[in-house]
Amino acid sequence: MNAHKERLESNLLELLQEALAGLNDSELNSLSVTKVECSKGKHHALVFVLSSDHKILSKLKKAEGLIRQFVLQASGWFKCPKLSFVSDNSLEKQLRLDAIFNEIAKGRDND
């Protein structure tokens, strides 16, 4: 990954967290953005949030225009990528892997 793309994603992550914190919806302004992946050319960004609730993801989709407007004003960019919000389940996967490794370790201890 090149440095420009990393910087862009990092800046966008910070701006998105600020934008969410400024919303009037208590469910949205307490969300955590964990990761942002931008496509080439900054046309599209995949935004990972710590929520698996479809209702919250739907609210984010409805608020996309306000969020993009905030990003444009705060960043000074000419255009903002189209945002797609998805649930970040990497923490759940990591917890499952840890549980599996613990079971394996217990099995070895019993031998």
UniProtKB/Swiss-Prot annotation:
The keyword Cytoplasm applies. One of its GO terms (biological process) is maturation of SSU-rRNA. It is found in: Cytoplasm. Keywords: Cytoplasm, Ribosome biogenesis. GO terms for cellular component: cytoplasm. Belongs to the RbfA family. Monomer. Binds 30S ribosomal subunits, but not 50S ribosomal subunits or 70S ribosomes. One of several proteins that assist in the late maturation steps of the functional core of the 30S ribosomal subunit. Associates with free 30S ribosomal subunits (but not with 30S subunits that are part of 70S ribosomes or polysomes). Required for efficient processing of 16S rRNA. May interact with the 5'-terminal helix region of 16S rRNA. This is Ribosome-binding factor A. It comes from Helicobacter pylori (strain HPAG1). The gene is rbfA.
